[in-house]
């Protein structure tokens, strides 16, 4: 429904398309905005879970970091554009997005610390790098910045991430 334009539909029309009662829909989400936030939150949780699954059997913290970042950068890819394009117009969306970015940033910092301990990367300010790497996709996904970059926010974030990771990686 989000792909087809939930903002254009009434709650009654959404309930009919989902084949549920209006009462049930209001129990799930008291408004269209809450329904959109609920849906986007679930999408972001699925991306995060997929990222965790992809790295669970990898031993190298640095390889985990590379794979994790590529996976979570999908949240700003073209496939998810429809979900996030008007998200900033919805009250409370910033808090939800900040929560996900905070989780990602914390996990990235953990992997950076583990990478230093494993002597896979240089000694760096892990907090600063985690903040940068955790928010890079979001920065490129803004309307203002999207117009300035040549590729999608996901491709651009991955490209810049590769440069940053190459700069801190120790030669084995």
Where are these regions (language model features)?
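Short, basic, alpha-helical segments at the C-terminal edge of helix-turn-helix-like DNA-binding modules
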Residues: 40-48
């Amino acid at each position: 429904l989000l792909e087809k334009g939930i903002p254009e539909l009434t709650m009654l029309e959404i309930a009919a398309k989902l084949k549920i009662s209006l009462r049930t829909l209001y129990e799930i989400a008291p408004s269209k905005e809450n329904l959109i936030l609920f849906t986007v939150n679930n999408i972001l949780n699925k991306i995060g879970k997929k990222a965790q699954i992809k790295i669970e059997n990898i031993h190298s913290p640095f390889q985990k970091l590379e794979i994790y970042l590529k996976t979570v950068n999908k949240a700003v890819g073209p496939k998810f554009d429809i979900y996030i394009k008007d998200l900033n117009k919805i009250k409370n969306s910033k808090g939800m997005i900040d929560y996900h970015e905070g989780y990602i940033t914390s996990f990235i910092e953990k992997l950076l610390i583990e990478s230093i301990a494993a002597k896979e990367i240089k000694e760096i300010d892990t907090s600063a790098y985690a903040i940068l790497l955790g928010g890079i996709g979001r920065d490129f996904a803004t309307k203002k910045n999207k117009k300035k970059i040549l590729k999608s926010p996901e491709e651009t974030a991955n490209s810049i991430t590769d440069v940053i990771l190459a700069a801190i990686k120790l030669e084995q």
